[in-house]
Amino acid sequence: VTRPVVDFPDEAMANGMTSTEQIIWAHRVDKGLSRGEFKPGATLRVYADLLPASDGTAPFSIHTFNQITGGNTIDPRQAAIANDHFVFTGKDEDEKQTSIGRAFAKIHSLGKPYYATPGDGIFHFYFPEQGLVLPGAFIPGAD
């Protein structure tokens, strides 16, 4: 797997940029983008270090992912799913919700720490505790 180059701006360019802007700049796909084109409201393609989802958001994310990529991952270590919302309820609709993430994890060989089973921990704590969230990383989320 070839990972994209993540280049943070030098001190001169970083001057006047927020920390968030520096992270987005570093993760942009189009390295030819000028500083003048990089501004609020611009549409950019970025490389994400991690694409986390909970059992609540995973079905929607997986559906969109499959539409865009045809179901092929660039790097399975970019995807992470935590089951912490719809577990232990005994409801069929909740089981259906979590089964989508389980099937995705199986197809793409996602295991711990990238796939958290019920009881492993709460989404927002689990991934950082597992060392998957690092300073300067670009990690989009639904909430």
Regions found by a protein language model. Name each.
Residues 1-142:
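Fe-S-dependent hydro-lyases/dehydratases of central metabolism
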